[in-house]
Swiss-Prot record:
Cofactor binding description: Binds 1 zinc ion.
Name of this protein: Endoribonuclease YbeY
Organism of origin: Bacillus velezensis (strain DSM 23117 / BGSC 10A6 / LMG 26770 / FZB42) (Bacillus amyloliquefaciens subsp. plantarum)
Domain of life: Bacteria
Keyword Metal-binding appears in the UniProt entry: yes
Lineage: Bacteria, Bacillati, Bacillota, Bacilli, Bacillales
Binding residues annotated for Zn(2+), in chain numbering: H122, H126, H132
Amino acid sequence: MSLLIDIVDETNSVSADALQEVEKLLQFAAEKEGVQDQAEVSVTIVTNEEIREINRDYRGKDTPTDVISFALEEEGEDEVEIVGADMPPVLGDIIISADRTKEQAEEYGHSFMRELGFLAVHGFLHLLGYDHMTKEEEEEMFSKQKDLLDEYGLTRS
């Protein structure tokens, strides 16, 4: 089973090793979550300013955030199922702020890689339909995140 992952670091500030680790982590998460073989996801690393613009334009919040996901396979009300649904799905896009990743790693006292992995998994779970709008959803999603990261070996220490 293999996830097709396109990772672009627009900031040129994240090491090739860290980007490769994100790819391995997302492959691991996809396998654990039973994601269809050859499903596609993109990960883009941006600056605080870039993610602030995206957050403002798409969420109405004029402030930087750590990660934003755009699921492409969600069907809303009154939407017709896409023809060719037997094709591997394009799950969507995960956009991560390198600046916020660094800030939060320092704030929480763990490595940049742990924070980057956390944000990648958080965004990936959103693409799979997980959310944290209610207490129950939050508990389910955050527990899933922790389990995936711990099992992969990217713990908070």
